[in-house]
Amino acid sequence: MATDRQYEDLLRLVLDTGTAKGDRTGTGTRSIFGHQLRYDLSAGFPLITTKKVHLKSIVYELLWFLRGDSNVGWLREHGVTIWDEWADPQGELGPVYGVQWRSWPTPDGTHIDQISQVLQTLRTDPDSRRMIVSAWNVAELDRMALAPCHAFFQFYVADGKLSCQLYQRSADLFLGVPFNIASYALLTHMVAQQTELEPGEFIWTGGDCHIYDNHVEQVTEQLGREPYPFPRLELRPAPSLFDYRFEDVTVTDYRHHPAIKAPVAV
């Protein structure tokens, strides 16, 4: 199996050519604007290998999004703490990703389940160009603990294969993006299984692609490592997209370098 270097090449590009910019957190970044990575999901599961990525957190976070949840309590019950820094004392985050995916509020007081709508369209009109899910609800941004970084995604069907493209307006390349790539690749596999399609491509499109100044040492260490071939994903069928459990997801042959710790910019 071929070794994929797209992500590492992007890290190097930003280190070498990025513009020094300030940011909301006050940390400082090196940044470029606009970049795309394409992953053929039949060639392996895109879980970055030049450092260990915590798969448990990725899977539980995606299941939490699909629950439509806005409280970190369920994540904490399963030993996942990646959202704790942004939660209030009651564990609430406001109307973040899962809320927008599953219950986008309308002016008449009802709610739209965007995920269910996309599933229905995939089954009845797979050539539609409207199979989009958005977390970027302008009217509710001020109530969110963190504005959506991975803002919206679109599905596309061709030759019996399902592809997904994500637009990530703000891309923390060292800490966040490896999670996001794997999460949406997993979602694409799940949706494909539920709609009797084969997984096609996952396409990651980044807007502000940045490396925080306090991650430069870690990125340099990571770039000194040779990538391994991607692992394989085994997904046990579930009755619906909303019935998958952690135990249904198995990643095999994940050969990786050691984890690299870095501070989160809050």
UniProtKB/Swiss-Prot annotation:
Which residues are noted in the entry as (6R)-5,10-methylene-5,6,7,8-tetrahydrofolate-binding? Answer: 54, 172, 265
Q: What class of enzyme is it?
A: transferase
Write down a Pfam family by its short name. Answer: Thymidylat_synt
Superkingdom to which the source organism belongs: Bacteria
Cellular compartment(s): Cytoplasm
| Binding residues annotated for dUMP, in chain numbering | 24, 129-130, 169-172, 180, 210-212
Which residues are annotated as active site?
A: 149
Q: Name one GO biological process term.
A: dTTP biosynthetic process
Asked if Ubl conjugation is a keyword of the record, the answer is: no
The question of whether Metal-binding is a record keyword is answered with no
The protein's annotated catalytic reaction(s) are: dUMP + (6R)-5,10-methylene-5,6,7,8-tetrahydrofolate = 7,8-dihydrofolate + dTMP
Q: Which GO terms describe its molecular function?
A: thymidylate synthase activity
Matching InterPro entries, A to Z? Thymidate_synth/dCMP_Mease (IPR045097), Thymidate_synth/dCMP_Mease_dom (IPR023451), Thymidate_synth/dCMP_Mease_sf (IPR036926), Thymidylate_synthase (IPR000398), Thymidylate_synthase_AS (IPR020940)
According to its UniProt entry, what is the function of this protein?
A: Catalyzes the reductive methylation of 2'-deoxyuridine-5'-monophosphate (dUMP) to 2'-deoxythymidine-5'-monophosphate (dTMP) while utilizing 5,10-methylenetetrahydrofolate (mTHF) as the methyl donor and reductant in the reaction, yielding dihydrofolate (DHF) as a by-product. This enzymatic reaction provides an intracellular de novo source of dTMP, an essential precursor for DNA biosynthesis.
**Similarity annotation:** Belongs to the thymidylate synthase family. Bacterial-type ThyA subfamily.
Q: What is this protein called?
A: Thymidylate synthase
What is the native source organism of this protein? Answer: Nocardia farcinica (strain IFM 10152)
Gene that codes for this?
Answer: thyA
